[in-house]
Amino acid sequence: MKVSYHGHSVVKIEANGKVILIDPFLTGNPKTDLKAEDVKVDAILLSHGHGDHVGDTVELAKKNNAVVVAPFELATFLSWQGVNTHPMHIGGSHEFDFGKVKLTQAFHGSSYIDEENKTITYTGMPAGILFTAEEKTVYHAGDTALFSDMKLIGELNKVDLAFLPIGDNFTMGPEDAVLAAKWINAKTVVPMHYNTFPVIEQDPYQFVEKLQNCTGKVLEAGESITL
């Protein structure tokens, strides 16, 4: 399994001959190396409905005939836009031809904001994502605060690689993320959701230096880890 980081919370996984994108915020993302028009993808996994995570999902899904896996309300909202979706919910898992997906809790919000019409559409509960393929498991925490049930994620799953937000303000900051890493007990931890905007500026190298009992790795956009 090859896992690549593409800025903010964008993660690409290549496994079982398929390409999977998590939270494909590409257009308008100053930290990504990807352009939506160049991306080929078989499946898109979404943690929640905020624009900096849904991103280019509709365009990518339609262009590639890709399935979008998302929490129920968000999946329904996207299906009304002509997207092929597979709805799930917290605690549920499903085996796809590209791998197994399980949604975990995340403590955050989830909504679609239409700034032109000044409306906010509720898109269900936010989620973290456990993705398993080729006997390896990747945990993408989505946007979240620190919460004690992260201990359960670590106890019930053998996590090989975890992506944790460290930006603070909208999610947990570096100090809480260090504790999250301890509880999740992943072999390798990569920081995400930082330095995209001034309000979430952090030093990822200071974060990984504080990690204990795991390998911390800062990935620049386009860099990858092979599991």
UniProtKB/Swiss-Prot annotation:
Keyword Hydrolase: yes
GO terms assigned for molecular function: hydrolase activity
Keywords from the UniProt entry: Hydrolase
Superkingdom assignment: Bacteria
SMART domains named in the record: Lactamase_B
GTP-binding found in the keyword field: no
Record InterPro entries: Metallo-B-lactamas, RibonucZ/Hydroxyglut_hydro, UPF0173, UPF0173_UPF0282_UlaG_hydrolase
Stored PANTHER family: UPF0173 METAL-DEPENDENT HYDROLASE MJ1163, UPF0173 METAL-DEPENDENT HYDROLASE MJ1163-RELATED
Family note: Belongs to the UPF0173 family.
Protein name: UPF0173 metal-dependent hydrolase BCB4264_A4722
Organism whose genome encodes this protein: Bacillus cereus (strain B4264)
